[in-house]
Amino acid sequence: LAKWVISTWQAPGANATHKGTFLAKNVTIVNGVLCLTLTQSTVSYGISSKGGEIATIEKFGYGTYEYSVRASSTAATSDAVGTPVSGSITGCFNYLTASATEIDIEVEGNERNRTTQLTTWINEAKPNEHTDVSPAGALPHEGFFDYKFVWTPGKIQFYRNGVLIGTHTKVVPTEPAPFMFNHWGTNSINWGGLATPDVIRYMWVKNFRFTPL
């Protein structure tokens, strides 16, 4: 982890009845695989979420980004059987302050766990978003999926398991940014789903590779 920074700040998804933070202890290496843990608990104001996030020290620009991820589930080891649980986001993305650059591949933990969200932002302007449905019999929480996006001037192409699943030619960032993996909680009837207190969830990451343009 020498080339990465572990986050210890407020997580996304806060509202009047939900607050989340990233904890250093929720980022571990287990048998050579990165594990980001998420827990949720009931507190006086509603729900408290404790997740994990890690970011590269180096900023990356145009090129090919590749990584293998098993989306949030109850699988306590990277090869165990696990189920998705409402109230979580599996995030894989590059990000620069105030979304000057943001290119996301995300998986929700609620009933829409079959979908992959592909989103690009520039300075928090209205995003360019595409939702892709996972192929039947291959769900992102059941095992590792190989994700890739190719970022070139004016275009981003998104791949899952070698198959092109989305192309963006609008709202395409230009500035280099760190790359991040995160696992954070939600408590919403929409994005990510309502919280599930007292159930530990795990996101697993096998590798990350960047090839410059």
Where are these regions (language model features)?
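Secretory/extracellular carbohydrate-interaction modules
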Residues: 36-115
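Short tryptophan-centered beta-strand motifs in secreted/extracellular beta-sheet-rich domains
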Residues: 65-67, 143-151, 156-158
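Short, solvent-exposed beta-strand-to-loop segments that form ligand-recognition rims
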Residues: 161-180
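Ligand-recognition surfaces built from glycine- and aromatic
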Residues: 64, 174-213
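Hydrophobic residues embedded in beta-strands of well-ordered beta-sheets
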Residues: 27, 32-34, 112-116, 156
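Extracellular glycan-recognition surfaces and repeat-rich motifs
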Residues: 2-33
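Glycine-aromatic-enriched beta-strand/loop faces of beta-sandwich-type recognition domains
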Residues: 95-144, 189
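Extracellular/lumenal carbohydrate-interaction signature centered on repeated Trp-anchored short motifs
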Residues: 54-65, 135-142, 199
